[in-house]
Amino acid sequence: MTDKTSLSYKDAGVDIDAGNALVERIKGVAKRTRRPEVMGGLGGFGALCRIPAGYREPILVSGTDGVGTKLRLAIDLKKHDTVGIDLVAMCVNDLIVQGAEPLFFLDYYATGKLDVDTAAAVVTGIGAGCEQSNCALVGGETAEMPGMYEGEDYDMAGFCVGVVEASEIIDGSKVAAGDALIALASSGPHSNGFSLIRKILEVSKADVQQPLGDSTLANALLAPTRIYVKPVLKLLKNCEVHALSHITGGGFWENIPRVLPENTKAVIDGSSWQWPEVFNWLQKSGNVETYEMYRTFNCGVGMIIALPQAQVDAALALLKAEGENAWLIGQIEQAAAGEKQVEIN
């Protein structure tokens, strides 16, 4: 008779105890993000959240996103504390362009072998992003999947729900010729274009620890995505805003037209700002054409706001008081049928 070894889940590469240890580590992170509308704490099968008081006809707005291959660079450089901020930013910034106030956030974290310290650093960043956007971290999923990911490599996705008054939804329908365009500065490449960034690093054989401006190339590339929630929501309460465009994958050419009516175009003054040094480095080191730069990267512009010319001074003053680097970047003009909807002069 042959003895059979008793196998466990841990023998198969899944450590339930490590998962439980992670949950204990991050309970305080979630607690710091709590909103009064949230019912209960972590650990339930689902998270419960009331609609905030004061809404007459509340509309829920949802969004989901990831961080893309910025994670590969972060993993290689063992910098896990800010990619969680990136994850939240990519989701909540997409909500506010429709006028929505973020309510709650959930994350999905998948790895081949769960490293509790790494995962806790990532989730701490998620908590920081939620605090910046006044959004409650109400739950998530940690999946340890041996054979699906190499070693301690990981991937993650975020999911966010917000709310907006039905009469205050921003959909670009009010955009008209004559509207002004205000830019909000980005903190760097944010979370887009990293497959090209990594290719440039490979081809140029660059040392990511080389000095760049006041810091290093690595720090410039991994700077967390700027979260615009609080200043933009304050702007929406105080100024008339016709559209907002989050400059993400697809850059200027693809994101601005998403909020423009037919027969209008955005005319951008390319001399109204200087690209941050990291974008000049990327263009030079990768010999990237300017059109491709504007197609792949934000080039220093994280968000663009369309509003009436009469609102420009008040909007700029408010945004600067909120700590944003904001400037007049262009205007909306009439466009002929079939004409491209974005010009950069």
From Swiss-Prot:
Keywords attached to this entry: ATP-binding, Cytoplasm, Ligase, Nucleotide-binding, Purine biosynthesis
GO molecular function, one term: phosphoribosylformylglycinamidine cyclo-ligase activity
EC numbers, comma separated: 6.3.3.1
InterPro entries to which the protein is assigned, alphabetical: PurM-like_C_dom, PurM-like_C_sf, PurM-like_N, PurM-like_N_sf, PurM_cligase
Main location: cytoplasm
Annotated GO biological process: 'de novo' IMP biosynthetic process; adenine biosynthetic process
Subcellular location: Cytoplasm
A Gene Ontology term for the protein's cellular component: cytosol
Claim: Cytoplasm is one of the keywords in the record: yes
Pathway in which the depicted protein is active: Purine metabolism; IMP biosynthesis via de novo pathway; 5-amino-1-(5-phospho-D-ribosyl)imidazole from N(2)-formyl-N(1)-(5-phospho-D-ribosyl)glycinamide: step 2/2
Catalyzed reactions per annotation: 2-formamido-N(1)-(5-O-phospho-beta-D-ribosyl)acetamidine + ATP = 5-amino-1-(5-phospho-beta-D-ribosyl)imidazole + ADP + phosphate + H(+)
Annotated family: Belongs to the AIR synthase family.
Protein name (Swiss-Prot/TrEMBL): Phosphoribosylformylglycinamidine cyclo-ligase
Natural source organism: Tolumonas auensis (strain DSM 9187 / NBRC 110442 / TA 4)
Gene name, Swiss-Prot/TrEMBL: purM
